[in-house]
Amino acid sequence: MNIDDLKRCLNDIKYEDLEKLKEIILSKDKIIILGNGGSNAISSHIAQDYTKALGKKGLSFSDASRLTCYMNDYGIEKAYCKFIEHFAEPDTLVILISSSGNSDNIVNSAEYCVDKHDMIILSGFDKNNKLNSYSDKSLLSFWVDSKEYGVVESIHEIILHSLM
């Protein structure tokens, strides 16, 4: 991981956005956090921290049995949409994380949430990634200006941990 890149990306985070994130998270009772790979690990970690430290109903989609069932029955591209459909309530906040911003299942989840659920999106790599195109339809959007997975994932976790 390039430490200079990490420092630069940390400095790019706006304090006002972290304050807005805190306000949004504290105003919600149920929060679903979704990601793939390393972002899924972040989702699981943050969901349990929001439950333990903040008393929120934090959910991630990381149970292997349920995840593979949904992927088999609905296809990987729609599995997360179905998870949201089955577990979200009208006022549920959905946080979508994709380092590249181009994971079809995460992008499809953003499309699904439009007009149904409030969402926060976190992405990286190319600013014109597919997920970032939903930033105007989300309550808040964080884009990390790096093409390194380690940097993007670290910044995403720092952002989501910032209100703890």
Region locations from a protein language model:
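A short, well-structured juxtamembrane/interface segment
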Residues: 9-28
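Helix-enriched interaction subdomains in cytosolic or periplasmic regions
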Residues: 1-10
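Glycine-rich phosphate-binding loops that contact phosphosugars or nucleotide phosphates
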Residues: 33-164
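Residue-level detector of alpha-helical secondary structure
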Residues: 5, 20-24, 42-49
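Short secondary-structure boundary micro-motifs
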Residues: 7-8, 15-16, 33, 70
